[in-house]
């Protein structure tokens, strides 16, 4: 389709190789580690239906269970050498959790277009790249890094009847026609990595006996400082474009809820890449510093969040890591 999905793109390509085996209803418990060889030797799974435990062996393991899933698996893969989680000699596994913060921006009405409507598939939205803290001219004194905008225009539907004046037959007749056009801009902003934003294993376990994750994460001073600018700049742009009755919004409440971490669904950073094994889990090729035949190429590898959707970056990192792993295998290094 026009919108990417693994089901329509990468999985069919993998199936055509004849070397893909999909094992459904398999819950990963941990990775199997050989202390004597310092290698992962496979994956330990639990059958979701029978609760039977099985192991799948492999020369090399790519762990890509999403940021929180991969981190949970690594933390639960304990051994004599790694009592605090596999490949965690640095102690930073689980730290520096990030997500994009958003739900702040502006929206207003577009006059004079009541006779215009779109046909066929929905039109695409717009994107405004980051424009803060790029150089001295755009530098802010109250925060570093910045945000971009995702936006679009639409006509209100019958749902506007919940707040529109009127009742009865007249209201119903009005709601049969498309409403006014409006346009909105929503900021997607960068979150800085901070060690205190972290996940650890809980004492509680799930139905498969696997420890749950305990998540401690909140926006820091830098994220909070940019949110007013996220809303005000959106309003300024819309008004300059001729949009009327512009109103700003920020759904983050004083108690920290409403726009809290996790709602962006772009979790990343908990098994970060880095040059120094003392401060990172993975090297520049997404290879674990501590365990050479283990690679992690999902969002947990990210060292910073930027302010853009990250999936294509994960795919690029995965392609590069696969190329490196193949070369390492051919050389007999892993």
Predicted regions, residues:
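Conserved redox-cofactor binding core of oxidoreductases
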Residues: 1-28, 254, 258-263, 272
């Amino acid at each position: 389709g026009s919108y990417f999905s693994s089901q329509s793109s990468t999985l069919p390509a993998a199936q055509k190789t004849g070397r893909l085996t999909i094992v459904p209803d398999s819950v990963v418990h941990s990775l199997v580690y050989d202390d004597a060889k310092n290698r992962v030797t496979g994956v330990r799974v639990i059958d979701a239906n029978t609760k039977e435990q099985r192991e799948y062996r492999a020369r090399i393991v790519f762990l890509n269970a999403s940021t929180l899933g991969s981190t949970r698996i690594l933390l639960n893969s304990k051994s004599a050498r790694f009592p605090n989680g596999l490949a965690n000699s640095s102690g930073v596994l689980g730290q520096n959790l990030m997500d994009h913060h958003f739900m702040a921006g502006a929206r207003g009405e577009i006059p004079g277009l009541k006779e215009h409507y779109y046909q066929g598939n929905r039109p695409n939205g717009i994107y405004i790249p980051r424009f803060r803290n790029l150089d001295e001219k755009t530098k802010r004194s109250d925060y570093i890094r910045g945000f971009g905008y995702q936006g679009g225009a639409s006509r209100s539907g019958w749902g506007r009847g919940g707040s529109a004046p009127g009742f009865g037959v007249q209201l119903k007749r009005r709601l049969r026609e498309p409403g006014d056009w409006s346009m909105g801009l929503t900021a997607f902003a960068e979150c800085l990595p901070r060690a205190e934003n972290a996940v650890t294993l809980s004492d509680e376990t799930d139905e498969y006996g696997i420890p749950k994750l305990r998540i401690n994460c909140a926006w820091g001073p830098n994220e909070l400082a940019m949110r007013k600018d996220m809303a005000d700049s959106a309003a300024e742009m819309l008004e300059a474009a001729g949009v009327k009755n512009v109103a700003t919004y920020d759904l983050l409440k004083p108690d920290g809820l409403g726009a809290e971490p996790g709602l962006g669904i772009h979790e990343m950073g908990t098994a970060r890449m880095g040059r120094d094994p003392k401060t990172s889990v993975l090297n520049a090729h997404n290879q674990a510093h501590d365990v050479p035949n283990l690679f992690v190429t999902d969002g947990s590898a990210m060292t910073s969040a930027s302010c853009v959707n990250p999936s294509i970056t994960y795919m690029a990192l995965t392609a590069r890591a696969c190329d490196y792993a193949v070369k390492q295998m051919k050389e007999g290094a892993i």
